[in-house]
């Protein structure tokens, strides 16, 4: 996810909901999926659904049947209709490729606000975030998911940083929760440079932890070249978000997210790098800006399919 709105606008915290029949399998869908077009999915939150029925309608309009599903609305039954979501999705012919969990109090207004409020970093929101994550893990398990992604927050560059050990502890706690349910977790990229994240993952030392790589986030946060970052993080790659952006001209400010294919991501080089690291996993189209989300996602799908 990126910056244009507070994540809690559509991922509200509440008591655990019920989810109904499980769908999917407990295996991250990798090499057997065929070409890129067969691995495309859409991020449910990009469609800004007001209810489960609204999500189904908008998904149909994108032309995609595979989805990374936001778990918080299911947990809280936000807008209604999420009870029994697994069974309903299956009847719609949908495949749930993974889940996404939010954290409490994230403010994407500026780079400074998200640095202070993002992920599992803030002490003030950690107890509620941890409670929600435990409930989301139950939702993900009931849906038969093999992978969930989330923003860990801004990670320290140096082990000597006083927050380094704290974040290692919290993220191991999350990793172990999902490992006990035979699931993997993936940190979303962008808030730190690739070598920093790679070093943090090595120190974390949890085999069920990897990366959800988002090339646009590397540009939005101004954290380096996406293709070079992808090569660095290849050993931890679990899933990709497909999104595009233009880098800021004012250091310390956000870049601009744009429709896929119109920004600064070199998509040909990006997919070549994916092939080079041997990644055959899910590619989830994400759009978090603009007022034409369905149209932009459909255009992104068509753009990628023509590459």
Predicted feature descriptions by range:
Residues 1-18:
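N-terminal secretory signal peptides and thylakoid transit peptides that target proteins
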Residues 25-50, 54-62:
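C-terminal segment of N-terminal export signals and the immediately downstream linker at the start
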């Amino acid at each position: 996810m990126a910056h244009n709105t507070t994540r809690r606008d559509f991922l509200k915290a509440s008591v655990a909901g019920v989810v109904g029949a499980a769908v999917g399998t407990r295996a991250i869908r990798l090499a057997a999926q065929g070409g890129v077009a067969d691995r495309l999915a859409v991020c449910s939150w990009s469609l800004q659904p007001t209810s489960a029925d609204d999500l189904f309608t908008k998904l149909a309009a994108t032309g995609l049947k595979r989805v990374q599903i936001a778990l918080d609305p299911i947990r809280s039954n936000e807008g209604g209709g999420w009870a029994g979501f697994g069974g309903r999705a299956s009847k719609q012919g949908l495949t749930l490729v993974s889940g996404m969990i939010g954290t409490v109090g994230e403010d994407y207004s500026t780079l400074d606000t998200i640095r202070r409020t993002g992920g599992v970093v803030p002490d003030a929101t950690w107890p509620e975030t941890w409670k929600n994550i435990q409930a989301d893990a139950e939702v993900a398990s009931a849906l038969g998911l093999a992978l969930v992604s989330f923003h860990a927050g801004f990670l320290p560059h140096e082990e000597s940083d006083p927050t380094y050990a704290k974040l290692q502890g919290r993220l191991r706690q999350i990793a172990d929760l999902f490992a006990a349910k035979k699931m993997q977790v993936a940190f979303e990229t962008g808030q730190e440079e690739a070598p920093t994240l790679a070093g943090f993952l090595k120190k974390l030392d949890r085999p069920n932890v990897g990366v959800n790589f988002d090339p646009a986030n590397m540009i939005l946060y101004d954290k380096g070249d996406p293709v070079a970052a992808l090569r660095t993080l290849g050993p931890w790659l679990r899933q990709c978000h497909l999104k595009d952006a233009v880098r800021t001209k004012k250091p310390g400010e956000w870049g601009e997210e744009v429709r896929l294919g119109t920004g600064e991501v070199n998509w040909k080089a990006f997919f070549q790098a994916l092939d080079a690291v041997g990644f055959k996993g899910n590619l989830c189209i994400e759009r978090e800006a603009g007022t034409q989300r369905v149209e932009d996602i459909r255009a992104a799908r068509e753009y990628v399919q023509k590459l």
